[in-house]
Amino acid sequence: MKNKNNKLADCPYITLEKALGYSFKDKHLLEQALTHKSCKLALNNERLEFLGDAVLGLVIGELLYHKFYQYDEGKLSKLRASIVSAQGFTKLARAISLQDYLRVSSSEETSKGREKPSILSSAFEALMAGVYLEAGLDKVRKIMQNLLNRAYKRLDLEHLSVDYKTALQELTQAQFCVIPTYQLLKEKGPAHHKEFEMVLYIQNQMYATAKGKSKKEAEQQCAYQALQKLKGIK
């Protein structure tokens, strides 16, 4: 593993914990949450990611339930899906500069793995699972409320519920008179923890690949990447 931009080497946890608003009692648990499976170490963050997915789904659902009392079940589900996603968790992870602390293999480092939404969002889930195991749901609620306020200028359906696939299709139809196509590249993992990798083509040219916990999530990630390329967003 390279040490470039890996703050575990020089300032292990203080800055990250300050940004998070929580200091881990068990630093090994924190380190595990930051360790991607590519490192081939005895402990990585996959199990914590599994737990964090469930914890965050509950906490965010509860926060939205109380905040948006006027929304029906359909609107609440749509809003939650915008946050409880690879793109949503990546946004929250970047709010605390989590990418700077990830432990990834040399090959992932070379391919900018620490910036990949699939890796970054999974690490965020693992990190919050660690907080839950040490401090419980109340602490997770408090942290998530702070992070949501920090990461989003406005937390409502209009500003959060973005359908990247539809936005991309409208753009490609206007510019190229074609619609994007999506293809399943890989499916792996047990039934309770599937990971799907999709590839997106525009005019038979590959524009993006992305992973997600469902085909729909992976397709949204692909569409988001393609929109960035087409609009020239860095």
Curated annotation (Swiss-Prot):
Mg(2+) binds at residues 49, 122, 125. One of its GO terms (biological process) is regulation of gene expression. Residues 13-136 form the RNase III domain. Residues 163-232 form the DRBM domain. SMART domains: DSRM, RIBOc. It catalyses: Endonucleolytic cleavage to 5'-phosphomonoester. GO terms for molecular function: double-stranded RNA binding; metal ion binding; ribonuclease III activity; rRNA binding. GO terms for cellular component: cytoplasm. Its cofactor is Mg(2+). It comes from the Bacteria. It holds the Pfam family Ribonucleas_3_3. It is found in: Cytoplasm. Keywords: Cytoplasm, Endonuclease, Hydrolase, Magnesium, Metal-binding, mRNA processing, Nuclease, RNA-binding, rRNA processing, rRNA-binding, tRNA processing. Its EC number is 3.1.26.3. The active site is at residues 53, 125. The keyword NAD does not apply. It is an enzyme of class 3 (hydrolase). Gene3D superfamilies: 3.30.160.20, Ribonuclease III domain. Digests double-stranded RNA. Involved in the processing of primary rRNA transcript to yield the immediate precursors to the large and small rRNAs (23S and 16S). Processes some mRNAs, and tRNAs when they are encoded in the rRNA operon. Processes pre-crRNA and tracrRNA of type II CRISPR loci if present in the organism. Belongs to the ribonuclease III family. Homodimer. This is Ribonuclease 3. It comes from Helicobacter acinonychis (strain Sheeba).
